[in-house]
């Protein structure tokens, strides 16, 4: 839309099945004032979309030969056919954009008018059309009408369901134009593109903006091809860039890109993608090279790095005289002085790094479908193959400072990591390797020999390095310390510990997309999906998924309440309940919502409140399948809809089962815990 001094554009009568006009676009830019509509009192075109399913009791004589869908009314059938043919007969008279349905065109016109007449009564956000408002309301109601047929998970919006279903189908429609890697989510592709640390050689001759990729430049140049003469609209500008900057001050309310999670609307796709990252726990592509911290955007990273002040630097470099905060930072710096600098390549994007710490921090940005790789010798787990290969070399010969083997075999094919070639194959199991030395190391697995024995407990190991690592469990020596919090451990546990600081969770659940720091956590979590309950109660026969839950359950038989309040003498079975109770005496509300700032005295209340923002509905009615955000709503539903009046809901667990038992012509119900 351009700033234009002319008569209001009047759409031909009955163009859209109405005699009303769209809000006109008479605007004055000569003084740089904000745009204002001259006929704001005109009625807004509210779009009412009729659902053909309302006439569910009538016949549907119109059948689509392409997909078999049936329709009651011929106009709906004809509109549907256009979706298959790709026809778009309804064009916008302002920007020439075309649509298959008239209703979509009417919705689109609100982009040009800037009006948002539909307000949310819960949070005062406004929207251009009724459909956007209805989608947004699901944030408050928690409604999730779109269910995945594969796993039963529900979603508030169809586009989110479509995105989720790709995790089942494996479809990856978004490809990187630089390296060909494919992704199931557009957001992951955008994050991946940032890993191509390239210069920006592609210059826009119109505005001087530079781009890393030619394709991005070509896409950008389209905005210049639609620019009218710079002096046409009154105010003049020296170049197109300044005109675009000027026009942006008048289009602040025209934001056609809605967030499907919270309903907020943005001016362009980049702003939308940046915002959507705040809703996820996904990868954070900006690692701090000083302390393993990883951040969502460059601004957060720079703010964090300012905490590494000059006053905290006490370790001097013998080469340059510079001082550093910790040993990790000093070693990273010193590696830049050596002539035999080790370039460790990233197998995902080809980037090279000075040391293993930098490489590990970088590789945490490649979280798309990471698969844990175990070392066959000692069981240590790694997140990528290059890291595993580097580790395996420590089982065969002395390693360099960075743990990279320097035998002649390992220098035969320096480009193998980039080509993916694995020329050395095991004749026993067919497994292939990059290096001959790693193959030799692997062959020991098939011999079964374990010549290294622990004199303390008699345990045997294939390699001496594994034995030394094991012996530290007897001596108490912890040779490796975390340079962030001074915790000590063996190297394998130290790597696990670093994930506390980096936030890396390389073990994904294939059932529900949750991720975990440790393999043991993932295995424990799987019991939720399998229903395995290996810990039975000897008193009542009830079984539990985890031993800790069984211990808590046993207190219901013994009556043990070990946690006592010193203020009022009240006792509690569980420590979290005791700690929550203490806040009733202090009046403190230590739990605050990061979304709206509301404070709560108890964590469970905060967690329940969060569901209002996330739309989560974990409580399901076993009678009709309806889901609810809060347990109290489920109880009310059982009573008012199904006539069920449970005697008590005394449990403090998250989930509730209502078991229906048939007794002749009647039914009885029993409320139980879901472990």
Swiss-Prot record:
For the keyword Transcription regulation, the answer is yes
List all Polar residues biased stretches. Answer: 304-325, 390-407
- Which GO cellular component does the record give, naming just one? nucleus
Q: Where are the zinc fingers (C2H2-type)?
A: 62-84, 90-112, 118-140, 146-168, 174-196, 202-224, 257-279, 286-308, 344-366, 373-395, 424-446, 452-474, 480-501, 507-529, 535-557, 563-585, 591-613, 619-642
Matching entries from SMART domains are given as:
ZnF_C2H2
User: Compositional bias of type Basic and acidic residues: which residue ranges?
Assistant: 408-421
List localization entries.
Nucleus
Q: Which Pfam families match?
A: zf-C2H2
GO terms under biological process: regulation of DNA-templated transcription
Q: Looking at the record's lineage, which domain of life comes first?
A: Eukaryota
Residues crossing the lipid bilayer are: none
Signal sequence bounds? none
- Using the UniProt annotation, give all residue ranges assigned to the region (Disordered): 302-325, 390-423
Q: Which GO terms describe its molecular function?
A: DNA-binding transcription factor activity, RNA polymerase II-specific; RNA polymerase II cis-regulatory region sequence-specific DNA binding; zinc ion binding
The question of whether Zinc-finger is a record keyword is answered with: yes
Keyword line:
DNA-binding, Metal-binding, Nucleus, Repeat, Transcription, Transcription regulation, Zinc, Zinc-finger
Q: Which InterPro entries match?
A: Znf_C2H2_sf, Znf_C2H2_type
User: Of which family is this protein a member?
Assistant: Belongs to the krueppel C2H2-type zinc-finger protein family.
Q: What does this protein do?
A: May be involved in transcriptional regulation.
> What is the designated name of this protein?
Gastrula zinc finger protein xFG20-1
Q: Which organism is it from?
A: Xenopus laevis (African clawed frog)
Upper classification of the source organism reads: Eukaryota, Metazoa, Chordata, Craniata, Vertebrata
């Amino acid at each position: 839309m351009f700033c234009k001094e002319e008569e209001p554009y009047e759409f031909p009568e009955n163009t859209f099945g109405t005699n009303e006009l769209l809000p006109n676009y008479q605007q004055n830019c000569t003084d740089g004032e904000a745009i204002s509509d001259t006929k704001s009192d005109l009625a807004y075109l509210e779009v009412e979309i009729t659902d053909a399913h309302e006439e569910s009791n009538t016949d549907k004589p119109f059948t689509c030969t392409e997909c078999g869908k049936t329709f009651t009314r011929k106009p709906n059938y004809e509109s549907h056919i256009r979706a298959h043919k790709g026809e778009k007969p309804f064009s916008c008279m302002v920007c020439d954009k075309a649509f298959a349905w008239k209703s979509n065109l009417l919705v689109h016109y609100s982009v040009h008018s800037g009006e948002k007449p539909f307000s949310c009564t819960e949070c005062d956000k406004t929207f251009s059309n009724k459909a956007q408002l209805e989608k947004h309301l699901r944030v408050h109601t928690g409604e999730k009408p779109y269910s995945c047929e594969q796993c039963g998970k529900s979603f508030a919006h169809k586009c989110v369901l479509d995105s989720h279903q790709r995790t089942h189908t494996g479809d990856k429609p978004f490809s990187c134009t630089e390296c060909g890697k494919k992704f199931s989510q557009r957001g992951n592709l955008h994050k991946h593109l940032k890993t191509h640390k390239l210069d920006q050689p592609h210059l826009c001759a119109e505005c001087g903006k530079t781009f890393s990729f030619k394709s991005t430049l070509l896409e950008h140049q389209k905005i210049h091809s639609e620019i009218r003469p710079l002096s046409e609209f009154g105010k003049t500008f020296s170049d197109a860039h300044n005109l675009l900057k000027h026009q942006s001050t008048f289009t602040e309310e025209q934001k056609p890109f809605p967030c499907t999670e919270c309903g907020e609307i943005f001016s362009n796709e980049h702003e939308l993608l940046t915002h959507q990252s705040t809703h996820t726990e996904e990868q954070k592509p900006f690692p701090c090279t000083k302390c393993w911290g990883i951040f969502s955007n460059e601004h957060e990273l720079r703010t964090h790095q300012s905490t590494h002040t000059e006053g905290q630097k006490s370790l001097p470099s013998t080469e340059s005289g510079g001082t550093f905060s910790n040993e990790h930072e000093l070693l990273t710096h010193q590696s830049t002085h050596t002539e035999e600098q080790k370039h460790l390549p990233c197998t995902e994007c080809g980037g090279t790094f000075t040391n293993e710490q930098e490489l590990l921090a970088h590789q945490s940005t490649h979280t798309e479908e990471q698969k844990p790789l175990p070392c066959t010798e000692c069981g240590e787990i790694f997140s990528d193959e290059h890291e595993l290969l580097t580790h395996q070399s420590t089982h065969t010969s002395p390693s360099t400072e960075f743990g990279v083997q320097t035998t002649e075999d390992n220098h035969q094919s320096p480009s193998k990591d980039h080509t993916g070639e694995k020329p050395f194959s095991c004749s026993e199991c067919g497994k292939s390797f990059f290096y001959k030395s790693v193959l030799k190391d692997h062959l020991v697995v098939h011999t079964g020999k374990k010549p290294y024995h622990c004199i303390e407990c008699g345990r045997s190991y294939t390699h001496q390095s594994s034995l030394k690592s094991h012996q530290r469990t007897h001596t108490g020596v912890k040779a490796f310390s975390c340079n962030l919090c001074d915790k000590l451990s063996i190297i394998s546990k130290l790597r696990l510990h670093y994930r506390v600081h980096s936030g890396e969770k390389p073990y994904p659940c294939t059932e529900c997309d949750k991720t975990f720091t440790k393999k043991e956590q993932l295995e424990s979590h799987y019991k939720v999906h399998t229903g395995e309950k290996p810990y039975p109660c000897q008193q009542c026969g009830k079984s539990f998924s985890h031993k800790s839950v069984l211990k808590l359950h046993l207190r219901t038989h013994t009556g043990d309440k070990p946690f006592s309040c010193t203020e009022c003498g009240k006792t509690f079975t569980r420590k979290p309940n005791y700690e929550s109770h203490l806040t009733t005496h202090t009046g403190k509300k230590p739990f605050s919502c990061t979304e709206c700032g509301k404070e709560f005295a108890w964590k469970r209340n905060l967690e329940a409140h969060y569901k209002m923002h996330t739309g989560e509905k974990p409580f399901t009615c076993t009678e009709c399948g309806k889901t609810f955000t809060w347990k109290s709503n489920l109880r009310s539903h059982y009573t008012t809809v199904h006539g069920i009046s449970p005697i008590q809901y005394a449990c403090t667990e998250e989930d509730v089962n209502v078991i229906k038992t048939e007794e002749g012509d009647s039914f009885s119900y029993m409320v139980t815990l879901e472990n």
